Regions:
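Short glycine-/small-residue-rich Rossmann-like dinucleotide-binding loops
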Residues: 84, 166, 202
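Gly/Ser/Thr-rich helix-start
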Residues: 86-88, 168, 207
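Conserved catalytic-core segment of NTP-binding enzymes
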Residues: 121, 141-156, 170-213
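Primarily NTPase-proximal linker/entry elements flanking Walker-type ATP/GTP-binding cores
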Residues: 1-111, 118-139, 144-154, 158-163
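Short, glycine/acidic-enriched loop or turn micro-motifs at the edges of active sites
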Residues: 115, 167, 205
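Active-site beta-alpha loop architecture of Rossmann-like, nucleotide-cofactor-dependent enzymes
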Residues: 24, 168-169
Length: 213
């Protein structure tokens, strides 16, 4: 902006810019308060210096520490969900490769039977990762695929079963019921397994990602 000094007007415009960027009100408030504190402590007067501080503050607020998933250490079933086109199948493949590299025995369930070529895509990822895949026919029952995959995971003593699923919105009742059916099968057939559900989101979605979740 064209501000020459750091004053209330400067902070008000900065707040508006951050909120318009869909950072969220709570995070914006934390960024502004942290910035004000640093400006006061360091007795900063120049806007150009404040801009550098702002970048550091935003990075600190957005920082996510790398943590191990619980399912890396337990016999687990991981359900991958999300809307269409966000990269669920690719995420399944990459996660499988990462776990395989750590010495885990992984099985993939191709439970996205709706999207054309989804099974072929996941098969390619399973080949790259060097892991087994359980698949049915395109247009088949996803719950049946998960049932077969759960039994295969138990029989082969797999460490992690990762289930790819079709893209769905939370307001599509039939697809959400399909997801509930899959969950019921896992709970019934593999109650001893640790459960994890991962939602894959588009990074440009912004605050609407909370609605999807």
């Amino acid at each position: 902006s064209g501000f020459s000094e750091i004053d209330d007007d400067f902070y008000e415009e900065l707040e508006e810019i951050l909120i318009m960027a869909d950072i969220g009100v709570a995070t914006t408030d934390r960024i502004i308060e942290d910035l004000k504190e640093k400006v006061k402590e360091q007795k900063i007067k120049e806007v150009s210096v404040c801009r550098e501080l702002l970048m550091d503050t935003i990075k600190q607020q957005m920082k996510v520490d790398e943590t191990a998933y619980e399912f890396e250490h337990k016999t687990s079933v991981v359900l991958m969900i999300g809307v269409n086109g966000v990269g669920k199948t690719t995420s399944v493949g990459k996660l499988a490769g990462q776990l395989k590299a750590k010495g885990k025995k992984v099985i993939l369930a191709a439970a996205d039977t709706f999207r054309a070529a989804a099974i072929e895509q996941l098969t390619e990822w399973s080949n790259r990762a060097g892991v087994e895949i359980i698949a049915g026919q395109e247009g088949g029952d996803p719950a049946s695929v998960v049932f077969d995959a759960v039994n295969a995971a138990k029989a082969r003593k797999a460490d992690v079963l990762i289930c790819d699923t079709a893209g769905r919105l939370h307001n599509k009742k039939n697809l959400m019921e399909e997801l509930r059916k899959i969950n019921r099968i896992i709970e019934r057939e593999f109650p001893e397994a640790y459960r994890e559900t991962l939602i894959v989101l588009d990074g440009t979605t912004g605050q609407n990602a909370l609605v999807q979740a």
